[in-house]
């Protein structure tokens, strides 16, 4: 709470409903008040930070990661390059480079909605994460951004495994 324009009731309400329908307990986290991620947190969801994390939040998230915690990072396209040192430090733990300015635009008209290159129908790759929506045509991305990761050798050194969940043209 406090680092993103999104919350469980604003911008993320559909994700919130979906996760609750899957019998998950969902709660906002005020990491500045607690100074840590709760021990019973199975997955920490981070949504498009609009300011850098302070040291308290960064240390709490890094501690959570180092204890084997799971992160679901959702990021929309950005219009201006920002230097979020602490956000980038957390991303680097997983071999993810800082997010770049710009949105993905589809070039294959058969994968667009209403011939709009900003409304993308991705190819969902099969995995444990996507098995319930694999072969679905109901997934559309708007304002999507590219995720750049380090090369395979660097990922191996970080002990990080990359799994493609979706692909676009």
Q: PLM features: what roles do these ranges have?
A:
Residues 1-169:
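Short, surface-exposed patches at the edges or C-terminal ends of soluble domains, predominantly
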């Amino acid at each position: 709470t406090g680092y993103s324009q999104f919350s469980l009731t604003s911008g993320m309400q559909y994700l919130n409903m979906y996760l609750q329908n899957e019998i998950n307990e969902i709660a906002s986290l005020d990491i500045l008040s607690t100074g840590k991620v709760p021990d019973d947190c199975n997955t920490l969801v981070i949504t498009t930070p609009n300011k850098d994390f302070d040291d308290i939040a960064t240390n709490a998230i890094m501690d959570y990661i180092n204890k084997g915690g799971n992160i679901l990072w959702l990021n929309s396209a950005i219009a201006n390059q920002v230097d979020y040192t602490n956000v980038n430090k957390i991303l680097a733990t997983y071999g993810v480079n800082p997010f770049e300015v710009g949105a993905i635009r589809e070039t294959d008209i058969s994968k667009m909605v209403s011939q709009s290159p900003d409304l993308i129908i991705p190819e969902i790759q099969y995995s444990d994460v996507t098995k319930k929506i694999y072969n679905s045509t109901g997934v559309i991305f708007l304002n999507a951004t590219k995720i750049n990761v380090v090369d395979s050798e660097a990922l191996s050194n970080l002990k990080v495994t990359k799994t493609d969940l979706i692909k676009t043209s």
